[in-house]
């Protein structure tokens, strides 16, 4: 039993809790700095040439699961250890402190009062009357008062002892919610052009919600830079009912546990007409060699497919740059403008943007929100000082002894006692 007690004392020590919090904070920082959930090849390409912190290459990174820090075995172990430490601390330290604060202690001798942190002695002509005044004054100031055989015990702020317990409970719930969300949550990133949709599966791998992009709009500043982008999406239930919602950057849609973010934008296709052909919707792809936000495609201008040109564009507003196969810029075509290019009449009908949507389903979010609320309440309660006052009298000496304790702000309590004395003197 002695060894078990020693282990529990070590486990619930403040030093261990601080060390665990420090390790978890460092782990979260690593998870922020290192891209998560990428392919193994991504880490080999990026971290073998430039190791993280100069020493952690791709092999070490993958071995210790830094590619998915928040679901790694060692990170979950740290969370479980911290949760266990907080639980043991609450049961072995905080609950007994709360229980002690709720118990009434009956001090019967002046010597006990004199040993308290704050103590005063009052000479009075009428002890019974003075005790009654003190009792009424304490009640008036919000103290909980108990009188036993002419002895007064009073306490205030006992609820403050509940604060640390609530903080521990909130932190445990926070870790449970975050872990549950990491293990069971889902994240989907998808670019959709207007009219396209994505089907989501429920927990039984059956078709659930359908997210359809109805309209996508990019707002640009006078220099042509994207300032805001908005999507109007239809959320379609399996039974066919649907709701139309608008989302934009910093204004996501929350729907039955699903959060839909407006995360990015792109260009999906160019609608073009060559000579007398029907309107052709040609997909375009990013061309990183030409710039960070440049999309393009190669098309032939005649039926044999040999006379090719490169179309590039960096905005849904145009223009479309047309290059020869040797890289020479032939022309720039605006939307709904047509021009002869290498013997073919080319007309740009429109440029179709696509909306970058980020879908997140995190079942741990309600528990995380609840935990934050509990932590805030616990933190607020922890500020409250728990104060206790005892009052005794000796009729033979016409003396009243008053003393008190406080877990914090002892100077505040030492100022209250003179006020009580002043009240009696008046």
Curated annotation (Swiss-Prot):
Protein name per the record: Cytochrome c biogenesis protein CcsB
Pfam families documented for this protein: ResB
Organism this protein belongs to: Prochlorococcus marinus (strain NATL1A)
Entry keyword Membrane: yes
Compartment annotation: Cellular thylakoid membrane
Keywords of this entry: Cytochrome c-type biogenesis, Membrane, Thylakoid, Transmembrane, Transmembrane helix
Assembly description: May interact with CcsA.
Source organism phylogeny: Bacteria, Bacillati, Cyanobacteriota, Cyanophyceae, Synechococcales
Transmembrane regions listed in the UniProt entry: 14-34, 72-92, 162-182
Domain of life: Bacteria
Listed InterPro entries: Cyt_c_bgen_Ccs1/CcsB/ResB (IPR023494), ResB-like_domain (IPR007816)
